[in-house]
Every structure is written in structure tokens, then in C-alpha cells.
């Protein structure tokens, strides 16, 4: 009888939990300074990190800027947020932008005071910066699970020296940044990640890694994880099928785990700038759609050898619901009530 009951229950066990079920909540302290707070699914006001941890989310991504003009996302800001993440029992993923402001495929501006003319000087500055960041967290007894050397660097990093006109320079910079992490005082060395945009495009992913590794400046042993962004609203070509192929090829070609480190799905998108991918076109723009998208995305990651996790980008950024896209609202929070959506729990159960 027990055996038959057990067998009957087995179909409900659709997949094992991903290693990383994460969210980027970098904006939290700024939002709290503006007076915002959050409510759980029972309508009770709680700290956002508590709501996320209670939902099963186990890792938090934080962006780090070098010398921001107003202190936003600098090292002190991130220490304050990381202490709360640690207290909530979640792991920490630091996303080093290596800039004083946003770094992405269209802008990789070198921090103020760092060299833009001498590669040797810039390598040394980058090494000392990643070393300092890690040692500061070590001094505060905060472990770092993952650290990425740059953010969406398919077009290079630390421009102009790290532009794609010289993949040798890109490789040398990544090597220096990685070794600042490896030489730090952290008791456990973080997993070092390289993060590119357009994770669905195997051609773009492979071109970057094949080219930069061929220079001999970046060694395969310098880093541990591939990180990719996957946003379905920026290209009709960003199908789940393409992502599945890209992740599988990345892992099999270079023998490293893969993580989807940025993604979104809208609850409202009346005027998308681009057609949505064909194999996602049936998913509604709603909370239920967020849930369905996350489950399908998780299935792709889980089906990939060494596919480790999914991070949702800025699910609670009230006041910026479009999150830079042409969609009206990609949040997992109802910004009219400050209450989280059920999709938060879906993310925590992936």
C-alpha cells in the first residue's frame, strides 16, 4: 500500500531544485530610503530579503560600482545589503560592473582614476580592486558564493583598452581580475564568473570565448562559471530552443557550469518593441505567465549538464517597473499595493 502511494506521488516530483534560485535586489536600500516597503503574500509588511528567503529563494545578486558619484552601489552600500542577505540565510553573488555607473553592451566606461592609456597599469588597478573587494568582505565575515568580472562584457570591458579591437587585452584584464579574487583572504574562494549578454546566441557566446581563450591571456582555469543574460523581449530570435542549444554547447565545449543570471517576464507589455520569440508566444503577460515562463526556463537550465540556476533581475524595483525594456511591468511586486506576486514563490521552488 505504501509503495503504491509513493509511486502515485512520483509524477508530482517534476524536477530537482536548481542550485541557485536567485534574484537581483541591488536597488533595495535606495528604495527603502525613498520610503518603500514590501508585503508578503499574506499582506504583512516584511523585509524584502525575508520575503524572498521564505519563498525559497536562496541566492541574491548585487551590482557593485567602483566610484559612483552619489555612493549608489559602491562597496559600503553592498556591504550593508550583504549583511542582511547573510542574516536571511541566502548566498551572495557580486556582480562587478567595473565602472562608476551602469556597464552593459553599450557602455563599459573605465572608472575614474583608472588608466585608459596603459594596459599594465589598468591590469594592476583591476587586480587590486577585486582583491580589495574580496578582502573587505572577508574582514566582515561575509562569504561570496559567486563573483563576476564585469557585467555583460560581450563587447568588452574597461573601454577603450578592453574593447573588442583587442581580445588579447580583454583576456589579460579578465586574468588580472580573476587573480585578485584568487589571492584574497576569503576562506573559500568564490566561483569566478564571466557574464555575457544574449545567452540564447551560441554563435555570439562561442565567438567571444573562442577568441579570447585563443590569445592565451585568459586561461580556462581562471574562471569557473558561464553567466548569461536571457531577455525574451529584446529579440524574436531569443527562443527557449536557442537558449537550450547555446547552454548545452557552452557546457560541452568548454566544460564549465552555466547560470542564467538575468531574466524577466512581463505582467504587462501592451507595446513591445520587438516580437516575442515563437516558442514563448503562448505565455500570457501576467503573474501566471511569469510562473509559466520561469518553469519553462528552469526546465531548460535543468536539462543542461551542469546547469545551475536562474536569477531574476530586479523583481521589486518599484518606480522602475519596465526595468529598461519596452514592456510596462516586469516586476514580481504589485506596485499599487507593495505586495509580492505568487511568482516569487515559483522562483523559489525552481
Curated annotation (Swiss-Prot):
It is an enzyme of class 3 (hydrolase). Residues 1-16 form the signal peptide. One of its GO terms (biological process) is pectin catabolic process. The active site is at residues 152, 262. InterPro entries: Glyco_hydro_53, Glycoside_hydrolase_SF. Belongs to the glycosyl hydrolase 53 family. Keywords: Glycoprotein, Glycosidase, Hydrolase, Signal. One of its GO terms (molecular function) is arabinogalactan endo-1,4-beta-galactosidase activity. This is Arabinogalactan endo-beta-1,4-galactanase. It comes from Aspergillus aculeatus. Optimum temperature is 40-65 degrees Celsius. It catalyses: The enzyme specifically hydrolyzes (1->4)-beta-D-galactosidic linkages in type I arabinogalactans. Optimum pH is 4.0-4.5.
Amino acid at each position: 500500500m505504501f509503495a503504491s502511494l509513493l509511486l502515485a506521488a512520483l509524477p508530482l516530483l517534476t524536477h530537482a531544485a536548481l542550485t541557485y534560485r536567485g534574484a537581483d535586489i541591488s536597488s533595495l536600500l535606495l528604495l527603502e530610503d525613498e520610503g518603500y516597503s514590501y508585503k508578503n503574500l499574506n499582506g504583512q509588511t516584511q523585509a524584502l530579503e525575508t520575503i524572498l528567503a521564505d519563498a525559497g529563494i536562496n541566492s541574491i545578486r548585487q551590482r557593485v560600482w567602483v566610484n559612483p558619484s552619489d555612493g549608489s552601489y559602491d562597496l559600503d552600500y553592498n556591504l550593508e545589503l550583504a549583511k542582511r542577505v547573510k542574516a536571511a540565510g541566502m548566498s551572495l553573488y557580486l556582480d562587478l560592473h567595473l565602472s562608476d555607473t551602469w556597464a552593459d553592451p553599450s557602455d563599459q566606461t573605465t572608472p575614474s582614476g583608472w588608466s585608459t592609456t596603459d594596459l599594465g597599469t589598468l591590469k594592476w588597478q583591476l587586480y587590486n580592486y577585486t582583491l580589495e573587494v574580496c578582502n573587505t568582505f572577508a574582514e566582515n565575515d561575509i562569504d561570496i558564493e559567486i563573483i563576476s568580472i564585469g557585467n555583460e562584457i560581450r563587447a568588452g570591458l574597461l573601454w577603450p583598452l578592453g574593447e573588442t579591437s583587442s581580445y588579447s587585452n580583454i583576456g589579460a584584464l579578465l586574468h588580472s581580475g580573476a587573480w585578485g579574487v584568487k589571492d584574497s583572504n576569503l576562506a573559500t574562494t568564490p566561483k569566478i564568473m564571466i557574464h555575457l549578454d544574449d545567452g540564447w546566441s551560441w554563435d555570439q557566446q562561442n565567438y567571444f570565448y573562442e577568441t579570447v581563450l585563443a590569445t592565451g591571456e585568459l586561461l580556462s582555469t581562471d574562471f569557473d562559471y558561464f553567466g548569461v543574460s536571457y531577455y525574451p523581449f529584446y529579440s524574436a530570435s531569443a527562443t527557449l530552443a536557442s537558449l537550450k542549444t547555446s547552454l548545452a554547447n557552452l557546457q560541452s565545449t568548454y566544460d564549465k557550469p552555466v547560470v542564467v543570471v538575468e531574466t524577466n517576464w512581463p505582467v504587462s507589455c501592451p507595446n513591445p518593441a520587438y516580437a516575442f520569440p515563437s516558442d514563448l508566444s503562448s505565455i500570457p503577460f501576467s503573474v501566471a505567465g511569469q510562473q509559466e515562463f520561469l518553469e519553462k526556463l528552469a526546465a531548460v537550465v535543468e536539462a543542461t549538464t551542469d546547469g545551475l540556476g536562474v536569477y531574476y533581475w530586479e523583481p521589486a524595483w518599484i518606480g522602475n517597473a519596465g526595468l529598461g525594456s519596452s514592456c510596462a511591468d516586469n516586476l514580481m511586486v504589485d506596485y499599487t499595493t507593495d505586495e509580492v506576486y505568487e511568482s516569487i514563490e515559483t522562483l523559489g521552488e525552481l
